[in-house]
């Protein structure tokens, strides 16, 4: 609507044109090159295993660490920016071998393939900022890191990062570090969390329905 466009352009996003101009001057790939999935092949910026990054977007960080085996902390925007400028970031946390050890063993004991975002939410809310080593998920992902598994883990990881604060997870027999090091990635005092059908149902039912009409359908989704 005219009113909606007017409010967005003149109030909510009034500085957007300025930001886009600055990004163009910095060398952005193209005018539509805005994405939270900056690791995708089509972006041309896919990190290699072991490569150190200066990123801050939480779902990108957890994907890079877990699925690609790169190394990156959940940086603030300032650390992200300064790391990109000077070419260095502080060496701690998920940049270190010790910081990448799993302090949780998560056992998947569901009777069917768990919905990625629900499973990610369950694990994220349980382990928060810790590193989980996930056992049994490979049964549902086909045993290899193919495109289907990457898509699943993209959604799964985003949920662990947003409903918790997970920056790295290992999936046994699937993710690169888990394939290379196996259970050597697990810390000696790791805790255990079992995810079965009942646990996923508990997490699902814990989400509040804040609409006046519980069965209503949304007009807009973001």
What spans do the regions from the language model cover?
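Non-transmembrane, aqueous-exposed alpha-helical and coiled segments at domain scale
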Residues: 1-221
């Amino acid at each position: 609507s005219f009113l909606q466009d007017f409010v967005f352009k003149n109030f909510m996003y009034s500085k957007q044109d300025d930001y886009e101009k600055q990004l163009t001057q910095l060398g952005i790939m193209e005018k539509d090159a805005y994405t939270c999935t900056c690791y995708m092949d089509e972006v041309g910026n896919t990190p290699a295993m072991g490569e150190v990054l200066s990123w801050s977007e939480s779902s990108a960080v957890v994907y890079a660490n877990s699925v690609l085996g790169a190394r990156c902390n959940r940086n603030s925007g300032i650390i992200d920016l300064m790391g990109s400028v000077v070419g260095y970031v502080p060496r701690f946390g998920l940049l270190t071998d010790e910081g990448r050890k799993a302090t949780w063993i998560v056992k998947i004991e569901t009777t069917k393939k768990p919905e990625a975002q629900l499973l990610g939410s369950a694990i994220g809310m349980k382990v928060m900022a810790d590193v989980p080593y996930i056992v049994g998920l490979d049964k549902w992902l086909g045993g290899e890191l193919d495109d289907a598994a990457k898509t699943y883990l993209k959604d799964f990881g985003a949920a662990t990062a947003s409903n918790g604060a997970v920056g790295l997870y290992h999936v046994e027999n699937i993710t690169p570090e888990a394939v290379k090091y196996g259970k050597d990635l697990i810390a000696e005092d790791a805790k255990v969390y079992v995810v079965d059908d009942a646990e996923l149902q508990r997490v699902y039912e814990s989400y509040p329905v804040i609409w006046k009409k519980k069965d209503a359908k949304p007009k807009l989704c973001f």
